Amino acid sequence: MRKKLKIAASILCLTLAGSVLAGCGKEEKTVSTDGSTSMEKVIGALGEQFEADNEGVKFTYNPTGSGTGITAVSDGICDIGLSSRALKDEEKSKGLKETILAYDGIAINNENTIDDLSLDDIAKIYTGEIKNWSELGGADAEIVVIGREAGSGTRDGFESITKTEKKCVYRQELTSTGDVITTVSSNPDAIGYASLASVKETVKAVSVDGVTPSEETVKDGSYKIQRPFVLVTKEGTKLSETAQKFFDYATSSAAGAIISKAGAVPAN
């Protein structure tokens, strides 16, 4: 009787072990991305097409902001980080690598009668030197300055280009591109900055130094407030087969039409 029980137990153990090994051998086809909220339209469109072209693949995007996305890939929490600014030297020194996916304009939004601002005007508005729209030929109304939170790639890019780092005086610091657009569209005295790829018809994008933000003016460099959309990976850490396949697809010329349709300028 004991011999039969031992044989049965051995068969059960082998069966369970076989099941575990079979499960381990089956690779889950997933791609996880984390980071910039400005890249939502671009990365969402690429992920959707990648899923459609590759049966059984699950693509995820976590819109946490550029700084958090960079940290996530560094800590091994996601496959690919997303940043709407170039990596800093200290980030590169930690073994992080950037690959430029596309270029995006940072649109300056307002809902009043002002249609054009100089780069100098914009800097003075955000540092508090210009406080009223009447100083720029607009209505007698206090300018409500809206921006992104610290760590945002859009904020870093905007402040770097306008040379206003650590000088901006914000009325509100919001956590996503969508929040900036919604807030500015509901207040005629507000001004904000947002990804050109995310600007909707409900918000007016002013021209800067006479140049209207568009795919063409970002591409030819005449629109000065622009920055890269970056895929962030970690050197020495090999991507899964599925994640590598997505990375190769997203950075190929084949993805160019999708990136353009999403409102950005493809790097390739």
What kind of feature is each model-predicted range?
Residues 1-11:
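Bacterial N-terminal signal peptides that target proteins for export
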Residues 11-18:
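Core hydrophobic alpha-helical transmembrane segments of single-pass membrane proteins
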Residues 25-67, 71-78, 83-268:
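Exported/periplasmic ABC-transporter solute-binding proteins
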Residues 19-23:
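C-terminal motif of bacterial Sec signal peptides marking the signal peptidase cleavage site
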